[in-house]
C-alpha cells in the first residue's frame, strides 16, 4: 500500500504541473488555428517532427541516463549532471557547424531557428530530468508550468504583434526553454554542480552504454509516431497534414494524462524493481491504468465532434474525422508504453529497441498500403494497428522480467468495445452518440472493480492527508 501511496502522491504533484500547462496549450488551439494557415501549421508540425527525430541522435539521449543514474542513492550527482551537460554542449557545437554547412548549400530559411529550438530543448531536458531525479518534484512541476506560460506569451506576441509565422512559433519555444534553463540553474543551484573536472570517462561510458541503445529506440518511436505525417505531407501536402496535426490534439489529452502517470511511475518502478512483490505491484497498476485510459478515450470519442466545432478554426473542422481512430491508437500506445517501463527499470534497453524496431518497419509498410488505398485516414488506421501489435509483443516479452497477471476476459471485451465505438463514430452511423454512450457504460461496468479499488485508495490518501494536517 505504501508503494501505491507514494506513486499516487507523485502523480498528484506532476498532475498539477502537467495539467495546468497542457490546459493552457489546449486552450490556445483556437488561437493557433486562426492565426496560422493550414500550410503553416503543417510546416510547423514537420519541423517539430524533424527535431523529435534529431534530438535523441544529437544528445545521445543522455537525459535518460542522467535521470536513471541520478536516481541511484550511491551515485555522484554532480558527476552525472556534469557529464550530461558537457557532452551535450560538445554535440550541440558539432550540430551547429553541420547546420551552417547545410544552410550554405540549401539556404533553407528555418535551419537557424530549428538549431536553436533543438539546442535549448536538449539542455532544458537534462536540467529538468536531473531535477526530477533528485526529488525536487515541486520545482520540476513549477518549471513545467512556467515554461509553457512563457512560451505561450512569447507566441502570442510573435504571431499577432510581429507576425513572424512559423519562425515566431518556434522562437516562442526557444524563449520558453531559455527562461526554464535559467530558473532551474538558480532554483536548484545547478550552476554549483556543473564542473569540467567532474567529467569521468568511466561513468560516461556506463551512461552512454545505457543511453545509446535508446537512440535507435527513439528513431523507431519516431517512425511509428510520425511516419504517417511525413507520408501524408508527401502524398497530400502540408494543408492536409495541418488538419491531421490538429486532429492529434484531442488524443494528446490522453497522452498528457498518461505522461503525468509515467513521470511518477518511473520513480516508483526504478525504486521497487528488485523487490519480491514487484509482480503484484505491476499487475495492480497495469489494470488501474488500463481502465482509466480506455474509459477516457471512450469519453473523448463521444465528444470529438463537439470539441472540434468549439475549439478549432473553420479551416480545420475536418480534423474530427481522424480523432476516434487516433484515440484508439493512443489507448494501445499507452499500454505498450507502460510495459516499456519494465525495460528501463531493468536496464534492458536492447529489447525496448527490438520491439520498437519490429513495429516501426511494419508501420512503414502499412502506411504505404493504407494511404494508397484508403487515403489520409489510412495513416491513422496503420498506426493504431502497429500500437496494438507493439502492446501484444511487449506483453509476451516482458513476462520474462515481470510476470503480470492479466485479467484477459475484461481486457479483451473492453478492447473490442472500444474498436466498435471507433467504427460507429467514424462511419457516423445513425444515433451513433446513443450507441457510444451505451458502450461507455458497458466499459465502465466491466472495469468497475478496478475503478472502485482505485477510488478507495484515493479517498484513503485524502483522509490521511487531512488527518495529518489536523494533527499539525
Give residue spans per PLM region.
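Interhelical loop/hinge segments that connect adjacent transmembrane helices in multipass membrane
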Residues: 1-3, 112, 166, 170-172, ...
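N-terminal membrane topogenesis motif
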Residues: 1-24, 67, 75, 201-217, ...
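Signature of the first transmembrane helix
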Residues: 4-63, 92, 96, 147-152, ...
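Transmembrane helical elements of multi-pass membrane transporters/channels
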Residues: 10-25, 147, 172-188, 201-270, ...
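Alpha-helical transmembrane segments of multi-pass membrane transport and lipid-handling proteins
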Residues: 19, 56-58, 82-113, 182, ...
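Helix-loop junctions and terminal segments of transmembrane helices
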Residues: 25, 58-74, 251-287, 340-345
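Hydrophobic alpha-helical transmembrane segments
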Residues: 143-190, 358-362, 376-397
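Membrane-proximal transmembrane or re-entrant/amphipathic helices at the cytosolic face
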Residues: 404, 423-472
Amino acid at each position: 500500500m505504501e508503494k501505491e501511496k507514494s506513486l499516487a502522491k507523485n502523480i498528484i504533484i506532476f498532475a498539477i504541473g502537467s495539467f495546468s500547462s497542457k490546459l493552457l496549450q489546449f486552450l490556445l488551439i483556437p488561437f493557433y488555428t486562426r492565426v496560422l494557415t493550414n500550410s503553416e501549421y503543417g510546416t510547423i508540425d514537420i519541423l517539430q517532427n524533424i527535431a523529435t527525430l534529431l534530438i535523441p541522435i544529437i544528445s545521445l539521449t543522455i537525459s535518460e541516463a542522467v535521470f536513471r543514474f541520478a536516481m541511484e542513492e550511491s551515485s555522484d550527482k554532480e558527476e552525472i549532471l556534469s557529464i550530461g551537460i558537457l557532452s551535450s554542449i560538445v554535440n550541440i557545437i558539432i550540430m551547429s557547424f553541420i547546420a551552417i554547412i547545410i544552410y550554405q548549400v540549401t539556404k533553407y530559411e528555418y535551419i537557424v531557428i530549428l538549431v536553436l529550438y533543438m539546442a535549448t530543448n536538449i539542455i532544458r531536458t537534462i536540467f529538468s530530468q536531473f531535477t526530477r531525479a533528485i526529488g525536487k518534484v515541486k520545482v520540476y512541476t513549477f518549471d513545467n508550468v512556467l515554461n509553457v506560460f512563457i512560451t505561450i506569451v512569447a507566441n502570442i506576441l510573435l504571431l499577432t504583434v510581429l507576425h513572424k509565422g512559423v519562425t515566431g512559433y518556434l522562437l516562442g519555444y526557444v524563449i520558453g526553454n531559455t527562461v526554464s534553463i535559467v530558473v532551474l540553474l538558480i532554483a536548484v543551484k545547478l550552476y554549483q554542480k556543473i564542473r569540467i573536472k567532474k567529467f569521468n570517462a568511466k561513468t560516461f561510458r556506463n551512461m552512454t552504454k545505457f543511453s545509446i541503445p535508446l537512440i535507435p529506440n527513439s528513431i523507431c518511436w519516431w517512425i511509428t509516431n510520425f511516419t504517417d505525417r511525413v507520408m501524408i505531407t508527401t502524398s497530400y501536402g502540408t494543408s492536409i497534414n495541418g488538419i491531421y496535426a490538429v486532429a492529434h490534439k484531442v488524443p494528446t489529452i490522453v497522452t498528457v494524462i498518461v505522461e503525468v502517470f509515467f513521470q511518477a511511475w518511473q520513480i516508483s518502478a526504478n525504486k521497487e524493481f528488485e523487490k519480491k512483490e514487484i509482480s503484484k505491484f505491476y499487475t495492480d497498476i497495469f489494470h488501474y491504468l488500463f481502465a482509466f485510459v480506455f474509459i477516457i478515450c471512450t469519453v473523448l470519442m463521444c465528444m470529438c465532434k463537439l470539441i472540434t466545432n468549439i475549439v478549432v478554426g473553420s479551416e480545420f473542422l475536418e480534423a474530427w474525422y481522424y480523432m476516434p481512430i487516433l484515440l484508439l491508437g493512443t489507448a494501445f500506445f499507452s499500454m505498450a508504453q507502460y510495459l516499456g517501463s519494465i525495460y528501463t527499470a531493468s536496464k534492458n534497453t536492447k529489447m525496448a529497441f527490438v520491439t520498437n524496431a519490429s513495429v516501426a518497419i511494419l508501420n512503414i509498410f502499412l502506411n504505404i498500403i493504407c494511404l494508397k488505398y484508403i487515403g489520409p485516414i489510412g495513416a491513422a488506421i496503420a498506426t493504431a494497428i502497429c500500437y496494438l501489435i507493439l502492446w501484444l509483443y511487449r506483453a509476451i516479452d516482458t513476462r520474462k522480467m515481470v510476470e503480470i497477471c492479466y485479467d484477459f476476459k475484461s481486457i479483451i471485451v473492453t478492447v473490442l468495445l472500444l474498436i466498435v465505438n471507433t467504427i460507429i463514430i467514424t462511419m457516423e452511423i445513425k444515433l451513433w452518440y446513443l450507441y457510444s454512450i451505451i458502450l461507455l457504460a458497458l466499459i465502465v461496468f466491466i472495469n468497475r472493480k478496478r475503478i472502485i479499488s482505485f477510488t478507495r485508495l484515493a479517498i484513503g490518501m485524502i483522509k490521511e492527508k487531512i488527518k495529518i494536517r489536523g494533527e499539525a
